[in-house]
Amino acid sequence: MDSCEEECDLEVDSDEEDQLFGEKCISLLSSLLPLSSSTLLSNAINLELDEVERPPPLLNVLEEQQFPKVCANIEEENELEADTEEDIAETADDEESKDPVEKTENFEPSVTMDTYDFPDPYPVQIRARPQVPPKPPIDTVRYSMNNIKESADWQLDELLEELEALETQLNSSNGGDQLLLGVSGIPASSSRENVKSISTLPPPPPALSYHQTPQQPQLLHHHNNHLGYQNGIHQITSINSAASSCSSPDGDSAFGDSSSTESSNNRCRNSAFSSNDSCRDSLNTPSPTQVSPRNGELNAEEAKAQKIRQALEKMKEAKVTKIFVKFFVEDGEALQLLIDERWTVADTLKQLAEKNHIALMEDHCIVEEYPELYIKRVYEDHEKVVENIQMWVQDSPNKLYFMRRPDKYAFISRPELYLLTPKTSDHMEIPSGDQWTIDVKQKFVSEYFHREPVVPPEMEGFLYLKSDGRKSWKKHYFVLRPSGLYYAPKSKKPTTKDLTCLMNLHSNQVYTGIGWEKKYKSPTPWCISIKLTALQMKRSQFIKYICAEDEMTFKKWLVALRIAKNGAELLENYERACQIRRETLGPASSMSAASSSTAISEVPHSLSHHQRTPSVASSIQLSSHMMNNPTHPLSVNVRNQSPASFSVNSCQQSHPSRTSAKLEIQYDEQPTGTIKRAPLDVLRRVSRASTSSPTIPQEESDSDEEFPAPPPVASVMRMPPPVTPPKPCTPLTSKKAPPPPPKRSDTTKLQSASPMAPAKNDLEAALARRREKMATMEC
């Protein structure tokens, strides 16, 4: 009983303390809040306190007669508490096993200050973060114009010849129909014979007027009807001025077709329209710098730009997309080429090799580099170059390289290193022995790639994986399967159920890393990246970074990923590359020594086509002709024209023992003995031989191309007249000698030292000392 009374007293004291503490808190909050807010707070609290009935004090409820009965009930409840715990646990388990039913018991919520939401007098406005729009796709027109702007004059001449060849095919009866049907008029496998035949045409005149254009009147008429020029005036726009005045020139006047670009790449539809409309007026309206001040006459560059625009209009009719691309070589030099959208990488490599006189090998390739992403990859020969370029974003610093990569087809020359895995024997028979012959290798590679389907080498092992959003690397167990690349999130060797697909190879490409040790803190430089082909963003869901422990592991994984991506097309590309090499090097290897002089005579013509080193060609031709035909002369003709050009035409007479060659050299000034020009004495000997030779007929001789007559002997041996010395104005007189110097006194007089005895060597000094010593001993 006493314990019950003490508990009741403690409860009463605690209730009073809580009430006093609550009142103090309310008063403190009212003083801190503004007047309006404190009034609302106090009214709300009082209203709720009135609604809730406060229980009366315990001593007022319990009467003296009922107090013992209440204490007895409390003791009974304490005794029965332990007995009812097990029953309560069993009923709870039964309720959980049954279907959940919503409880509808009406409980009175407790009154707390958290249930009141007061309006904020100064609400904070949270603005949504603006989304960064993605970069627009590359504009092929602008890309081509930028490459042309940096090209040299001889490269522009080559481009003009290619466009003229295409224009000639479009004007023909069958060429236009073939291009409209999607058949290339200039096959990629053919040589540049048509282009060379067009290059023999006379060059365009240095100046053309708007109304006096004799070449191709039908082209101008068609061009005016399509572009809507008024009064039949064809407005000319130079390439350099168009590239500098507008960053995105019109698709009708540059190296591509806007309509064909839309059909091949729908992503750039809106950006192409906006860029074309913004620059249409600037291209159709000639600026004062584009038209020369001589009454509508054009200079040589504007005439070339006119021809290029005319040929491109014909390209538009054929729905052909061409991009002027720049390829870099290992020494930094740029090779430029106009690429058709239907050309594969193999066709582009062949055109580059033929244009630049390079012996094409199987390991020649085109390498694509992404400087912003620090990755690069080798284009496969069956891919389309134009399609890959159209996936770039605008103003991207991406580059294309033309180089040799021995690792391109290393898995064909060494299949025992790259294609063999512990599970290869489950699918096919493995040859015995470590040293495989060439026949065994070819047979194994053929069987490997002619399976259906082609299964890549099932590579397994530990590789480093870069964490998303951090420059930390963790080692995981990777497994390569035909469906994609899998890894285990846990570092230990997993089972099949623990593998997770990292990337599939259906819509992704395999790249290699560049400088990841400095950029991403990679543990080794042997890095592989798997990226979505159509996107160029540094996001973890689009690009994955993997690193191998050593170089051989890196090469094996790279080959396996390429086979999983491309399959049997790799072997087809290799066989086609070997066929192109045999076609290119076959005629050169069968050339005899008797026809070597003919080959040498063709070298200057090819060099003049590029206008690179005419002096080398001239020296080769002069020396070879003087050595092979010492009795047959050469007619050397010099013109004071610019630019310097060099051409050789060799012809044979009816008599087999007599041949003649006509050499035409055009220089800016008279020939001298510099490295760029033939020596003067050689030219004089050749000229004397040509004047005294009766083999050249009168029809081929031209008085304007001969050397002038030598000067007369008198003018050469003329001596200058003697020059008489001038007479002096005043007579010459002899000069007087200066007075002698005064005598010095004895104090200041220089005194010479006493003469020294002649110097003695060591032997003489020793002998003298010995004689003196012996003389003293005798005394």
UniProtKB/Swiss-Prot annotation:
InterPro entries: GRB/APBB1IP (IPR039664), PH-like_dom_sf (IPR011993), PH_APBB1IP (IPR039665), PH_domain (IPR001849), RA_dom (IPR000159), Ubiquitin-like_domsf (IPR029071)
Polar residues compositional bias, start-end: 189-200, 256-293, 645-660, 688-698
Boundaries of every Ras-associating domain copy: 317-407
Disruption phenotype annotation: Defects in axon guidance in HSN neurons although axons reach the ventral nerve cord in the end. In max-2 and mig-10 double mutants, the phenotype is more severe resulting in axons failing to reach the ventral nerve cord.
Subcellular location: Perikaryon
Xref: CDD domains: PH_APBB1IP
Gene Ontology terms: cellular component: filamentous actin; growth cone membrane; lamellipodium; neuronal cell body membrane; perikaryon; presynaptic cytosol
Region entry Disordered, spans: 78-105, 189-217, 242-302, 645-763
Record's compositionally biased regions (Acidic residues): 78-97
Residue stretches making up the PH domain: 456-566
Domain of life of the native organism: Eukaryota
Biased composition regions of type Low complexity, renumbered to the chain: 242-254
UniProt keywords, alphabetically: Developmental protein, Neurogenesis
GO biological process, one term: vulval development
Biased composition (Pro residues): 708-729
GO terms assigned for molecular function: SH3 domain binding
Subunit structure: May interact (via Ras-associating and PH domains) with ced-10 (GTP-bound form).
Function: Required cell non-autonomously for proper development of the excretory canals and for the long-range anterior-posterior migrations of embryonic neurons CAN, ALM and HSN. Plays a role, probably downstream of ced-10/rac1, in orientating axonal growth of HSN and AVM neurons in response to guidance cues such as slt-1. May regulate growth cone polarization by promoting asymmetric F-actin assembly. May be involved in signal transduction during cell migration.
Family as reported in the entry's similarity comment: Belongs to the MRL family.
Identification of the protein by name: Abnormal cell migration protein 10
Organism (species): Caenorhabditis elegans
Gene label: mig-10
